[in-house]
C-alpha cells in the first residue's frame, strides 16, 4: 500500500502523455517534469506544436470546459478530445502563443497589461485640474468660503447674485422663462446683457445662448449679513452648485462653484473618476475621434490620382468615366464657370475650380434642360465630391459601398485631441506637470524612472493616496522591462505589435498575476529578440518556474536549450517522417545522443558562412531622410544583388525602416498601393528593380481549400493534364471538372470538402468523412478519369516526394513541385489544407512559388524574421533557397537576429544602439563582422 502511494506521488511529479496520435504524432509517450523549464524542439513540421498545443494544451482546456454545466457549454463551445490514450499530472494550463490576435484600434499596451487602469485611478485620485481656457488652476468653494470671499472682496459694494441655468446652448427657452417667472424672478442676464423676463419671452432657437437668473441685488454688509447668506444659498441651489457675482459699478463678473471651476472663465469640471481618463468610455473619449486618436479624411491625391486626365476620361477617380448622371452635370457646370470643359486635363483646371468641385459650390448650379431632359433648366445645390464620398462611407448602404468610399480616404491626426484620444477636460488634469496622455507616451523605462522620483515632486496628501497605486504600476512595469520591452509605451496600439512582442506582453502579465501550480505553454518566445534581450527573457521564464509553475516552451534557440531543465526532441525529420520522440532528458544527456538537433548543438553539423561574399550588381537603392517613429532622419544605401540582413536590438527601428517605410514606398510605386509609408525625404534607384515581394509567414489562404498545389499554381497544370487524357476528352471534361471548388466535378454532398460537419448541441462539432465520396472530394464520374492509375484525388493525397517521382516525365508540373522538394517540404501533401501548415512551412511554400517563376532577376524580396519556427536544419535549407534567388540576380532583405543568418549574409545593416528613443540610428553597414554576433 505504501509503495503504491509513493509511486502515485512520484508520478504526480511528472506530466505523463501516453499514446498521442494528433496529426503526425506516432503514438508517442512523453514525460515532462513538473515545476521545470522544458523545451520541445525539432524540425519544422516534426510535430512539436501537435504535442504541446494540440495535445497537452487542448486536453487541459477541454477538462476546464468540462467543469461547466451543459447549459454553459452550449454557449462556450466544446473542445474536441485530442487523439491521445491518457494524460496524467496535468495542471491548469495557460497558452501564450505568438499570434497577434488583437486588431482592435482601441487596444493598447496599457489596456492589455491593465497598467493603464491603475494610471487612470492615479490621475482620478491625485491629479490637479487646470482650465483649458486660461491655464489657471481650478478651484472649488463651500458656501461658507464663498461668503467669506464676498465679505473680503465686495464689502460695501453693490453686487448682483446670479445662478447659471443655460451655458452656451441652442434653443428658444420659452418654457424656462415661464418657469423662472413662476418662481418670482423678474430679471436674467442673457448672453451678457441684463433683461427683464416678460410673458411669452423666447430667444432665437438656432443660436447658442447663456442664461443666468438674477437671484438678488444687494450691498454687502458686515459678517452678520443674513440676506447675503440666504441669497448665496438660493443661488447655489438654483445654479446646481455654481453662481456668478457681478459688481454693479464695474460690470465685472466672477465665478464661484462647489465643483472644480476656473476663477477667470467660469468653466467647471465634474469631479474626476477613472472613466474620465478612459478613451474607451464616452465620459473620457475625445468627442471628435471617439477616442481613436485619428480621423478619416478624404485624400485629394486619391480622388485625383492622375492630373493629366480630364473629367471625360475619368480624372476624378470616384466618378469614373463621364456618363449621364446628375453629379457629372454638376461637376461640368463648375468647370464651365471657370472656362473649362469636360475635355480639359484636371492639371490645367484652376485650383479654385478644383476646390469648388471637391468642397461644394456656394451658389446653386444651373443644369441646362437639354442635359437634364426636362422642359426647364434645373437649379441644384452641389455639396462637392468630398461630401458625396463621406455620405457613402458613413451611410448604412452596405459593405461594398463603404469599401469603395474608404479607398479615397486617408487617416490623419485628430485635430481636436492631437492623437491624445481624450477630451480636453481630461487632458488638463496634471500630475507633476504631465497629463495622462503624456505619461502614457513615455517609453516604459522612462515611465518607470518618472514613477520612481514622483514622491519627491508631489504633496504629502498626494503621496499618501498614490503610494499603493504607484507600487502596483511599478511592479507590472518591472515585468515588462525584464522581458526586453523597455522601448514600448503604454499608448502603443496592440495591432502594431509583432507576434513576439504580443507574446512577451502576455508573458509579463502572467508573471505579474503571481499564479502558482500552472502549466504555461509558450510558442517560441525568443522571436524578435536580439541575443542581449534573450538573457532577460530566460531569466523571466525561470522566475515563472521558481514561483512553482511548469513552463513548457516550443523553441529552437540554443541559449534557451542550454538553460532548460529538460529537453524533448521530436523527429527524426518532418511530416510523415517525424512525429516520434527521438530524445527526452537534460541538455548534458542530449549532447551524448546522436540526433539531428544534438549534432548542431555539438558542432558536428553547422551552417558555415560563405567562403566569399557576393559582389552584387553594383547598383543600389537609397532611402534618404527616413524619420518615422524613432528613425533619426537616416540615409540608408541598400546594395542590390545581395542577401542583406537588417539586425539590431528589439525596438531599434528595423521594421520601421523596412516594413513601414521601404516596402510601402515600393508597393505604392509598383502596385499603386494605398498604404502610406512613414515620413522620408527621398528614394533613389527605383529604376534598378522591377518589383517588390513581401514573403511573410501568414497562411497561404483564408480557408482550408487553399493548399500548396493551388498556391504554386501547379494544380492548374495537373488539371490540364487530366483534361488531355482520352477518357476526359471523350466525356468532354473541361479543367473546371477537376476543381473541388466549383460545381460539376466535386462531390455536392460535402461541397468538395471531403467531410461533413455534424452539429452536437452539448458536444463539439463532429467532422465525419463524407459518406458519398469517402473523403475524396470528387464525384464518382470525375474519379474514373485516371493518369497512370491515379485519380485527381489520389494525386492531391501524394506527398511532394511521391509527386516528384510520379510526374517525372511531365516537365511543366515537375519543375514546380521539385522546387517544393528543394525547400525542404517533401513531406507535406500536395493537397494539404493551408491552415494545417506552420508559419515556417507557409513561408517556404511562398518562396518555392517565387523560385518556380520566370523572373527578371531584378526583384526585391523582404522577409521579416524568416527563422521563426525553424530548426537549425530548416535554417540551412532556407539559406540555400535564399541563395538561389540571389544568384539569379535578385535582392533579399532579411530582418533577423539569428547568428547563422547574419554570418551568411553578404551585407549587414545594424541598427541601434538601443530600443525606442535610444535607437533609430545606423551603427554599421558592410560585410558581417564577428563583433556583431557578440
Question: Model segments located where?
Answer:
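Conserved phosphate-binding elements of NTP-dependent enzyme cores
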Residues: 1-934
Amino acid at each position: 500500500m505504501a509503495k503504491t502511494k509513493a509511486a502515485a506521488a512520484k508520478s504526480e511529479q511528472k506530466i505523463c502523455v501516453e499514446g498521442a496520435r494528433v496529426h503526425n504524432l506516432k503514438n508517442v509517450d512523453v514525460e515532462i517534469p513538473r515545476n521545470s523549464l522544458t523545451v520541445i524542439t525539432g524540425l519544422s513540421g516534426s510535430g512539436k506544436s501537435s504535442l504541446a498545443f494540440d495535445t497537452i494544451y487542448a486536453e487541459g482546456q477541454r477538462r476546464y470546459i468540462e467543469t461547466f454545466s451543459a447549459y454553459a457549454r452550449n454557449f462556450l463551445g466544446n473542445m474536441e478530445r485530442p487523439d491521445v490514450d491518457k494524460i496524467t499530472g496535468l495542471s491548469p494550463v495557460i497558452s501564450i502563443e505568438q499570434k497577434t490576435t488583437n486588431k482592435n484600434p482601441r487596444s493598447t499596451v496599457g489596456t492589455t497589461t491593465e497598467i493603464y487602469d491603475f494610471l487612470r485611478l492615479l490621475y482620478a485620485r491625485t491629479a490637479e485640474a487646470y482650465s483649458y481656457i486660461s491655464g489657471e488652476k481650478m478651484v472649488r468653494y463651500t458656501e461658507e468660503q464663498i461668503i467669506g470671499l464676498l465679505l473680503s472682496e465686495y464689502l460695501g459694494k453693490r453686487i448682483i447674485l446670479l445662478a447659471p441655468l443655460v451655458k452656451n446652448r441652442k434653443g428658444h427657452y420659452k418654457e424656462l422663462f415661464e418657469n423662472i417667472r413662476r418662481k418670482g424672478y423678474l430679471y436674467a442676464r442673457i448672453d451678457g446683457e441684463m433683461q427683464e423676463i416678460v410673458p411669452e419671452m423666447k430667444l432665437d432657437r438656432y443660436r447658442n445662448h447663456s442664461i443666468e437668473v438674477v437671484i438678488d441685488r444687494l450691498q454687502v454688509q458686515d459678517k452678520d449679513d443674513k440676506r447675503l447668506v440666504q441669497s448665496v444659498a438660493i443661488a447655489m441651489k438654483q445654479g446646481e452648485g455654481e453662481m456668478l457675482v457681478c459688481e454693479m459699478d464695474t460690470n465685472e463678473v466672477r465665478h464661484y462653484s462647489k465643483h472644480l471651476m476656473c476663477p477667470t472663465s467660469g468653466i467647471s469640471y465634474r469631479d474626476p473618476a477613472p472613466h474620465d481618463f478612459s478613451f474607451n468610455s464616452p465620459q473620457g473619449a475625445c468627442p471628435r475621434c471617439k477616442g481613436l486618436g485619428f480621423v478619416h479624411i478624404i485624400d485629394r491625391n486619391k480622388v485625383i490620382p492622375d492630373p493629366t486626365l480630364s473629367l471625360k476620361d475619368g480624372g476624378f477617380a470616384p466618378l469614373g468615366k463621364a456618363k449621364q448622371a446628375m453629379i457629372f452635370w454638376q461637376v461640368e457646370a463648375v468647370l464651365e464657370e471657370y472656362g473649362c470643359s469636360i475635355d480639359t486635363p484636371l492639371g490645367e483646371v484652376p485650383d479654385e475650380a478644383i476646390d469648388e468641385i471637391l468642397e461644394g459650390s456656394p451658389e446653386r448650379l444651373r443644369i441646362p434642360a437639354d442635359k437634364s431632359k426636362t422642359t426647364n433648366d434645373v437649379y441644384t445645390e452641389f455639396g462637392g465630391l468630398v461630401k458625396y464620398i463621406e455620405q457613402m462611407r458613413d451611410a448604412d448602404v452596405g459593405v461594398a459601398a463603404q469599401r469603395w468610399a474608404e479607398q479615397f480616404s486617408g487617416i490623419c491626426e485628430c485635430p481636436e485631441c492631437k492623437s491624445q484620444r481624450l477630451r480636453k477636460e481630461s487632458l488638463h488634469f496634471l500630475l507633476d506637470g504631465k497629463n495622462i496622455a503624456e505619461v502614457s507616451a513615455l517609453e516604459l523605462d522612462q515611465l518607470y524612472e518618472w514613477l520612481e522620483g514622483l514622491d519627491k515632486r508631489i504633496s504629502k496628501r498626494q503621496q499618501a493616496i498614490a503610494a499603493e497605486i504607484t507600487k502596483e504600476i511599478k511592479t507590472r512595469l518591472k515585468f515588462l522591462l525584464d522581458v526586453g520591452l523597455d522601448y514600448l509605451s503604454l499608448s502603443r496600439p496592440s495591432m502594431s505589435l509583432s507576434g513576439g512582442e504580443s507574446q512577451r506582453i502576455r508573458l509579463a502579465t502572467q508573471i505579474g498575476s503571481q499564479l502558482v501550480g500552472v502549466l504555461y505553454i509558450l510558442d517560441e518566445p525568443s522571436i524578435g529578440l536580439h541575443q542581449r534581450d534573450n538573457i532577460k527573457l530566460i531569466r523571466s521564464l525561470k522566475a515563472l518556474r521558481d514561483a512553482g509553475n511548469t513552463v513548457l516552451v516550443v523553441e529552437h534557440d540554443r541559449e534557451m536549450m542550454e538553460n532548460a531543465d529538460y529537453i524533448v526532441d521530436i523527429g527524426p525529420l518532418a511530416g510523415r517522417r517525424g512525429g516520434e520522440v527521438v530524445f527526452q532528458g537534460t541538455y548534458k544527456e542530449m549532447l551524448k545522443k546522436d540526433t539531428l538537433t544534438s549534432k548542431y548543438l555539438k558542432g558536428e553539423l553547422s551552417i558555415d558562412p560563405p567562403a566569399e561574399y557576393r559582389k552584387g550588381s553594383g547598383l543600389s537603392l537609397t532611402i534618404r531622410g527616413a524619420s518615422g517613429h524613432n528613425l533619426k532622419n537616416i540615409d540608408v544605401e541598400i546594395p542590390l544583388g545581395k542577401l542583406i540582413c537588417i539586425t539590431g536590438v528589439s525596438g531599434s527601428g528595423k521594421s520601421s525602416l523596412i516594413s513601414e517605410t521601404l516596402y510601402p514606398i515600393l508597393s505604392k510605386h509598383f502596385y499603386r498601393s494605398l498604404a502610406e509609408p512613414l515620413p522620408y525625404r527621398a528614394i533613389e534607384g527605383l529604376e534598378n528593380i522591377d518589383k517588390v515581394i513581401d514573403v511573410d509567414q501568414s497562411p497561404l489562404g483564408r480557408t482550408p481549400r487553399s493548399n500548396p498545389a493551388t498556391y504554386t499554381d501547379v494544380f492548374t497544370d495537373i488539371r490540364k493534364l487530366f483534361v488531355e487524357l482520352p477518357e476526359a476528352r471523350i466525356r468532354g471534361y473541361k479543367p473546371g471538372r477537376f476543381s473541388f471548388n466549383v460545381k460539376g466535378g466535386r462531390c455536392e454532398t460535402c461541397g468538395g470538402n471531403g467531410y461533413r460537419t455534424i452539429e452536437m448541441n452539448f458536444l463539439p462539432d463532429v467532422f465525419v468523412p463524407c459518406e458519398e465520396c469517402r473523403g475524396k472530394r470528387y464525384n464518382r464520374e470525375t474519379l474514373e478519369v485516371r493518369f497512370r492509375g491515379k485519380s485527381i484525388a489520389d494525386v492531391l493525397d501524394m506527398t511532394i516526394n511521391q509527386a516528384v517521382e510520379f510526374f517525372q516525365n511531365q516537365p511543366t508540373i515537375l519543375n514546380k513541385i521539385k522546387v517544393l522538394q528543394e525547400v525542404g517540404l517533401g513531406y507535406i501533401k500536395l493537397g494539404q489544407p493551408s491552415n494545417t501548415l506552420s508559419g515556417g512551412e507557409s513561408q517556404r511554400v511562398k518562396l518555392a512559388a517565387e523560385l518556380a517563376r520566370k523572373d527578371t532577376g531584378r526583384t526585391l524580396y523582404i522577409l521579416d524574421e524568416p527563422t521563426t519556427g525553424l530548426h537549425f536544419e530548416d535554417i540551412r535549407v532556407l539559406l540555400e533557397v535564399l541563395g538561389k534567388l540571389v544568384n539569379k540576380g535578385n535582392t533579399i532583405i532579411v530582418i533577423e537576429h539569428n547568428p547563422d543568418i547574419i554570418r551568411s549574409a553578404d551585407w549587414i545593416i545594424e541598427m541601434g544602439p538601443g530600443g525606442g528613443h535610444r535607437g533609430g540610428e545606423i551603427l554599421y553597414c558592410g560585410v558581417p563582422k564577428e563583433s556583431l554576433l557578440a
